[in-house]
Amino acid sequence: MTKAILIFCFSLVATTLNANCDFSTVDFLSEIDNPSAIKRIEINVPKSAKFNRNFAKILTSKTENIPPELKKKFKAKLTVRYDFGSCVYKAKVRQNGDWKDHIVLKNGSPVRSINVKLKEGNILNAVEFKLLIPETRNNLNEVLGSIILRKLGYIAPETFQVETSVNGVSSTMIFQENASKELLERNNRREGPLFEGDEELLWSFENYPAFSLESLALSRSTNPKWFLKGKSSQHITLKAYEQLQAACLEYTQQYYVNGETLAIYPNMHLSSIFKDYASTLFVMNGHHALRPHNRKYYYNVFSREFEPIYYDGNFSLQEPALLPSPFSGEYKFPHNDKLHSENFKEEVFNDFSSRVIIGNWRSKLFVDKSFAQIEENVKQLQEKSNNVVAMSGKYRKASFPDNLKKYLDRENIFKVEQRKISSVELVNDDYKVSDLNGQTTILSPKEIARVISRNKLKGKRTIYLAEKTTDRDIDLKTRRIMAVGGYAVYSKGLSLKVDKNKRNIMIKQDDASDWILFKGVNLDGWTLSFDGAKAEDSRREYTQRFNKYGMTGCLNLYRSKFNNTKIYIKEGMCEDSLNIIDSTGSIKEVKVEKAYADGVDIDFSSVSIESLEVNTAGNDCLDVSGGIYSLDSIKLKDCRDKGISVGEKSKLTASTVLLDQASLGDSSKDSSIVNIASAKLTGVLVCAEAVQKKQEFGGASAIFGSLDCKGEILVDKNSIITRGAE
């Protein structure tokens, strides 16, 4: 074998993202993805005197909580030490936590929980995270609880024990990533709107006692930069925010006026996910995460519902649960079988033992004892549910006007002044907003972003409570398809025909931007045929990669299963002709002709394809990310940009690749590994590249058994391309 490695500074960003590691990340992709490989995290704050004075001010402040104005940011240098080398990154740090248990004196030296934002590099793909004093999260309970939730399918952050040193003071801390884009992708979700409970009114707001204004606290957006990316993301965020605000308003009205402990249901009781999440937290003694100000939310455009993001449950896994009143006598806890499964327990133990520094024997003891108590708590919860009479008369959903009136009454009682926006309407590139008092103004997208993320406008506290949530789904159809066991959501102009006998699904566009989303379907032995309209026959208005419903594909398949499936697509004006998300199985054939942009885009999936053919694509012919992909035969022609693009920690193997005409043949990026037995590429400027492009990943690898190509090979310092003898 011969190695062709060319350092080519074609992108300053790509070559410097991990320039401060004394090893090539591609050589240790599996190791740097394992928490146990991290031996120590060292943080040095150059302005140590100011940093220590900040600690002293927090310690001696007269408030019970940590004053927000003392959570100042400090520049820092962060070093991650492994057995095989170390990385040094620029970072910013600040005090973390609400209460003063996040600061302690250890042998006279200051130890504090801190928020860290890396300006370069990453730790286990995270660029924003917390280093927490273990006692603030009940130590091992937080690590194990986060793992169990993630294994059950909930969104939960990467969490592990790690040895640290901050300005020379050593301690064991809990590493926990923040709720961000990287967290979503780790949990197989595409970037989208993120929200949390609004805390501004809780902590020393205008000298009100802590928590005295909790009945006025609703929610806020935590990723306004995503909102500002374009009109589609603005549309999605505002629609979701209106729905969440109404749910939070309902909660405050019921909880604080009627005295009933109700969960927050942002999906309007149409889904059991928040009920199941609450029950799971109860049996794990993690109900602290259900406090409104600890709640975090993700809006999933594919399921068209909110999902909870775990945060700060204060788990006590080995204690009997304090169980609330059951939801109803018909409720069945959904995770009973899995929590009793020995295979599930073994998977959890393996993950746990690599994330703690107490040794395997103590780890096994802790896991076994925790599961024994959780199982008993589940039993008690189910027995309590079985014995309850269905609730009647206790809870009646109040109307939005009633909830709003009572909210305004409480606002007057507390003498809290807030501007209240009641409607938002897009006018060209700005927004026409109306207040409850009827006053109208024009706000820019940046001003709207500040309202929904900070509840502020021009220095004044301002909240958005939509009196009428606009029905923005009037141009969609939803259909349950019994033959494949799932649902289809699609544009009204699109034609959908299902032939159960021939196992064919035929889809035809009226407008070239029409689209369809299949959710949770089983396509065993089925053929999907998508007949698209010509690109010039389109009323397409969106300017981002996705439309106002978050779809990038003409044909979208979400959480679906394949076996001997065939997919044929022709034309259409979507960013992806075919988009497969979070799906599994084997596909016999995919054929795409005249793709407007990407031909085939697959994300967060584990899929094998026997034959894939793309003939003409306005961008990439094949683009995969965040998954495991195996293909026998790939035939690509006339790819405007890349023939094959593999990114975001993917593994792709292929037997044969035939490509004619592309700017770049194969691109392996961002901790991905490509292995192609035989490739023949003609009409390309660059045969292959292996690079790191995103901060949250490392280098990439591409291995060719044989590569017949006359173009360039591009490799950055963290990556490698290996070619067989020709």
Say what each PLM segment does.
Residues A4-T15:
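Bacterial N-terminal signal peptides
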Residues K456-E726:
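Extracellular beta-rich repeat passengers
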